[in-house]
Amino acid sequence: MANHKSAEKRARQTIKKTERNRFYRTRLKNITKAVREAAANGDKNAANEALKVANKSIHAMVSHGFIKKQTASRRVSRLALLVNKIA
């Protein structure tokens, strides 16, 4: 248990940041999974819609400071390549 006021505040902040990061991490996994599943099923329309949602969500995470801009671009690029491979 924290003995100083500043240490108590840091503990509170850590809890809030942990919850926020867990939310973003889970969301990132879920939207990526949705695109990959749609691509695996060969459904071009569903894959494109999922990619559109993923693109918007991933770049929103950049503005919230969860991931860096280059990381977001790389993830979106790889998902787009996957969707474009669908015949």
Curated annotation (Swiss-Prot):
Instruction: Name the GO terms of the biological process aspect.
Output: translation
Region Disordered: list its residue ranges: 1-20
* Coiled-coil boundaries: none
Pfam families linked = Ribosomal_S20p (PF01649)
Any GO MF annotation of the entry: structural constituent of ribosome
Recorded hits in Gene3D superfamilies, A to Z, give: Ribosomal protein S20
CC terms in the record's Gene Ontology section: cytosol; small ribosomal subunit
Which UniProt keywords are present, listed alphabetically?
Ribonucleoprotein, Ribosomal protein, RNA-binding, rRNA-binding
Q: Which family does it belong to?
A: Belongs to the bacterial ribosomal protein bS20 family.
| Function (record text) | Binds directly to 16S ribosomal RNA.
Q: What protein name does the entry list?
A: Small ribosomal subunit protein bS20
Cite the source lineage.
Bacteria, Pseudomonadati, Campylobacterota, Epsilonproteobacteria, Campylobacterales
